[in-house]
């Protein structure tokens, strides 16, 4: 994925730095002015301590006055997904997605079966299993403050307004002290 992204971004000057690292162990050679963490990547950190370490590493990586932007699935969205079975069927692709939310540990587990039609007419199956943890706005805000971020704001799903309970995805923006 990073190789494809790098090809598409190669014409930019300077080209953006794309990394594949464990977030809690993030290491850069130089500081950056901003960091963006998208597609609910924080939810994939299933241990609260790993989220805290990630925020600390980002604080150490972002220059003073720099920005951090990230998104998470709202707790309410993850709870609503419990027991859902979702289907997407097209001429050459069939996708089956099954979910389970374990409220006692705030974990969303989902399995994805993806079938792709091959040139010879056979269907090729890929299987993925994902685990995400739900975090409240209050938890994430406290951990950002502890790491040294200020001006912490939440934004609604694709709207420049404060996040509310109806938002399935919550965007955070903050500034490194």
Residue spans of the language-model regions?
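Conserved short alpha-helix immediately C-terminal to the canonical SAM/SAH-binding motif I
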Residues: 1
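Conserved SAM-binding loop
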Residues: 5-6
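Conserved SAM-binding strand-loop segment of SAM-dependent methyltransferases
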Residues: 11-28
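A short SAM/SAH-binding and catalytic strip from SAM-dependent methyltransferases
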Residues: 32-50
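A short glycine-rich, Lys/Arg-flanked "PGG" loop and its adjoining helix->strand segment in the class I
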Residues: 50-67
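SAM-dependent methyltransferase
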Residues: 69-142
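C-terminal lobe and adjacent flexible extensions of AdoMet/dcAdoMet transferase-like proteins
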Residues: 131-177
